[in-house]
UniProtKB/Swiss-Prot annotation:
Residues 1-142 are annotated as: Disordered. Keywords: Host cytoplasm. It comes from Rice gall dwarf virus (RGDV). This is Non-structural protein 9. The keyword Cell wall biogenesis/degradation does not apply.
């Protein structure tokens, strides 16, 4: 049958379009939960399965730095990775898919997820109940805690410690249950650990050893909540996309402005001077450090904020009684 040149040209164009579609390349977003990315862009071509299975360490995954005398650097999750594997089958994590997208709420505890069947059970609305009067809406805590109202802080902590985000969220929400009435930071941490352990154990989450690392997070989290109330703090301000924390620590003669963008693991302010893992303001017996990788940390170099996890936990875990 005779075929016109126009028809042949049309088929060639269709074939070319099909080939281009098969070879379409899409950038892959780093996986912040398992700390990995693909070895290259995502390919939908004939070798896509093989290409997309290759993974390299995520260059954007945070490192927890050990500022000990020997100058070692501890990689992300190295201390918890083996423990989490050993603990599989002993209660373990809730069988739940980690949400891929989080809507930023307007206050603490207002976290919603898209397409996550575990939303109501593990994320919930507001704080989980405790033994002393049930849950309290997060709004009662007021705007003085604006610095930590974004759930991306919890996500970042989970990534840092290689821990399940649902467990971490429940643990932190249990901590927030007791922060309103308590002023003394030591009592706050003690009581928070007790409440969180009781609540988490009742849900079959984690084990005793896992909580030793949580003490770091608890104190850092509580300290961040107090940041705006410290005498040396210049205050906290925020908008829908950024949090600005200005602080001048007179003991260390340090003045910094930290900018945090919700749902961002690595962030920089307009001067490109701050590159953050997470924000902790800790007492002297737990080292919170600003480590620079340049000559002048306020002149454009990166500033890393993290924890020295070589030291014992702030509150050693024991069979605590209710304070």
């Amino acid at each position: 049958m005779f075929t016109s040149s126009a028809a042949k040209t049309g088929r060639r164009r269709a074939s070319t379009a099909k080939k281009s579609e098969d070879e379409l390349v899409v950038d892959r977003v780093p996986n912040l939960i398992d700390g990995s990315i693909s070895s290259g862009p995502i390919s939908t071509g004939p070798d896509s399965d093989q290409n997309n299975k290759k993974k390299l360490p995520n260059p954007f995954a945070p490192k927890i730095n050990n500022l000990g005398k020997d100058g070692q650097t501890i990689e992300q999750g190295s201390m918890l990775e083996n423990k989490s594997r050993e603990n599989e089958g002993d209660g373990g994590s809730p069988e739940c898919v980690t949400p891929n997208h989080t809507d930023i709420g307007t206050s603490l505890g207002q976290v919603t997820t898209k397409g996550n069947e575990c939303h109501d059970k593990y994320i919930g609305r507001g704080s989980p109940p405790n033994e002393r009067g049930g849950s309290r809406p997060s709004q009662e805590r007021g705007d003085s805690f604006v610095a930590i109202k974004y759930p991306s802080m919890l996500t970042t902590l989970a990534v840092m410690l290689n821990y399940d985000i649902h467990n971490l969220y429940e643990f932190m929400m249990a901590v927030l249950n007791v922060t309103k009435e308590l002023n003394d930071p030591n009592v706050l941490v003690e009581r928070a650990v007790f409440d969180a352990m009781q609540y988490s154990r009742s849900r079959g989450i984690g084990d005793r050893e896992s909580y030793s690392m949580f003490c770091y997070m608890i104190h850092g989290y509580a300290s961040l909540m107090r940041l705006a109330e410290e005498p040396w703090s210049d205050g906290v301000s925020s908008n829908e996309s950024e949090i600005h924390i200005k602080a001048s620590d007179m003991k260390k003669s340090v003045g910094v402005t930290l900018t945090v963008k919700p749902n961002s693991l690595w962030v920089c302010n307009k001067n490109d001077f701050a590159r953050l893992i997470c924000i902790f303001t800790l007492p002297d017996d737990i080292i919170a450090f600003l480590r620079t990788d340049g000559e002048d940390c306020y002149g454009g170099s990166n500033i890393y904020v993290g924890l020295d996890i070589s030291k014992p936990p702030y509150i050693p875990l024991r069979d605590v009684e209710e304070p």
